[in-house]
UniProtKB/Swiss-Prot annotation:
Belongs to the YIP1 family. GO terms for cellular component: COPII-coated ER to Golgi transport vesicle; endoplasmic reticulum exit site; endoplasmic reticulum membrane; nuclear outer membrane-endoplasmic reticulum membrane network; nucleoplasm; trans-Golgi network. This is Protein YIPF5. One of its GO terms (biological process) is insulin processing. Keywords: Cytoplasmic vesicle, Endoplasmic reticulum, ER-Golgi transport, Golgi apparatus, Membrane, Protein transport, Transmembrane, Transmembrane helix, Transport. Residues 1-124, 168-173, 218-236 are cytoplasmic.
């Protein structure tokens, strides 16, 4: 036993005591801790500079109740991109500017030269009827063995441009190019009758010359009457009818020869 006591005495230092351990305890709340030497230079008070400014603003408290929206919230239904009611949409022909009633009235005005023309209807830009009449005129020439579609459209374009310049110089209100093309195209309808006669009969005799002169006068008189009523050019019908007669005379020459 004496040997065991000597071993314990050698293992433990005689100067060690619990009081010494309490003196070596670290004060972690102060600046004398073991970690204060390594991180003493870092200032934690500057961490707020990395926070965005919008996050630092105080948020508005929610004043509503559970399952009840606030008074400022007004729910709205999303608006659809396309209309749900197709009945409110205008017809396709109306969107394209094709009115069969006005086309029929303009056609009757051309077929009845003595009928008073409606200036409000004739002042519209309607090219559906003139395109059909130009195609019909070219088709009747084709039945007679004359392929003249290029001449028909070319002469029509040049004639419309010339009448457009002339009417703008003569009238006080002015006129659009579409209106001039529409009126001249509708007044081409009697010329279709002349080209239809040329399919069956020859127009190079005396009867053909008289018929051709009558058709030219018919077309030019109808066109001048419509221009006078649409542009309020009273007393100038003969001045307008003369260039119209020159234009329709070219179409008559194509039909006869």
């Amino acid at each position: 036993m004496s040997g065991f006591d000597n071993l314990n005495t050698d293992f433990y230092q005689t100067s060690y005591s619990i009081d010494d351990q309490s003196q070596q305890s670290y004060d972690y709340g102060g600046s004398g801790g073991p970690y204060s030497k390594q991180y003493a230079g870092y200032d934690y008070s500057h961490q707020g500079r990395f926070v965005p400014a919008d996050m630092m603003q105080p948020q508005q408290p929610y004043t509503g109740q559970i399952f009840q929206p606030t008074q400022t919230y007004t729910p709205t239904t999303p608006q659809p991109f396309y209309g749900n009611n197709f009945e409110d949409e205008p017809p396709l022909l109306e969107e394209l500017g094709i009115n069969f009633d006005h086309i029929w009235q303009k056609t009757l005005t051309v077929l009845h030269p003595l009928k008073v023309a409606d200036g409000s209807i004739m002042n519209e830009t309607d090219l559906a009827g003139p395109m059909v009449f130009c195609l019909a005129f070219g088709a009747t020439l084709l039945l007679a063995g004359k392929i003249q579609f290029g001449y028909v459209y070319g002469i029509s374009a040049i004639g419309c441009l010339g009448m457009f310049c002339l009417l703008n110089l003569m009238s006080m209100t002015g006129v659009s190019f579409g209106c001039v093309a529409s009126v001249l195209g509708y007044c081409l309808l009697p010329m279709i009758l002349l080209s239809s006669f040329a399919v069956i009969f020859s127009l190079q005799g005396m009867v053909g010359i008289i018929l051709t002169a009558g058709i030219i006068g018919w077309c030019s008189f109808s066109a001048s009457k419509i221009f006078i009523s649409a542009l309020a050019m009273e007393g100038q019908q003969l001045l307008v009818a003369y260039p119209c007669a020159l234009l329709y005379g070219v179409f008559a020459l194509i039909s006869v020869f």
